[in-house]
């Protein structure tokens, strides 16, 4: 069946369950569908339908299908930044938006902008990061003055394609401006260079929101921080998917990193962090990614949206898997090299990291009860 026909059939369904677990945070395994491109392209529409957005905004199904075909073309077959990734981010974001606090906070327009941003946020990704673009002095880095190079490209290309297709021509002038402006802000927030700043701002906004009396509303600025945070969280959600999915994605992340590192070596460019296959350890790097980036951000989001606590539970399980793998590798290496003293120090350090994580998680659970 052609994509447009399948999309029409989906959009006309009254009860579009379509895929088992698609509406649940833990129950949907997108890795089983990674090579079923047409099926992947239906998932964003299914997510819009969950909130009735296709009807509320009178989205033209054929135009939407055409946009999905453009997404298919522009999402290249890199190990990680591919069609499966942007579809996964969209489906995951849909589960965040369905939480009780998010449903009460966001408007239908907010949800539409966020979901369209999710499917568009990596359009035409080149399989290398911003630092590579800057060091390479690529056309994109020059065009965007070395600032959020790829994110600006994703925004400009996706909005250009939408305009060409007339995808949102039915929106009024004010709504269209809100759509394009907020979409730009949201996709820019997926730049990992913005991570720590966004995390700090999120923690402050969360304190404000918790202190707000029932019935009072957040400022538009603070609400945008929460919108950015949920999209960014969906973009870095691999570590808190069930272990088999987490490991599947991690393998692809590091494959793409190492392919970039190989290019950097061949082109005599500085090798980016985590991109040297000869020195980067996937297990240790994954624990550090969880501890320094994912954990603080997920915990802050969970303070704002308590239903996300189940993801924290899964994160703890996956962190233990990576930590156990790291300790085993260290033991195998150091015992073979007869470095018992170094091994004892290393194991003690990793046990200390785990204790710190577990303590912080216990405090989080207590605070949201």
Predicted regions and their residues:
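Hydrophobic alpha-helical transmembrane segments corresponding to the first two to three helices
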Residues: 81-93
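Generic structural concept
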Residues: 68, 72, 90, 117-120, ...
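Helix-boundary capping/turn motifs
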Residues: 62-63, 85-88, 223-226
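Internal amphipathic alpha-helical repeat/solenoid segments
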Residues: 52-78, 98
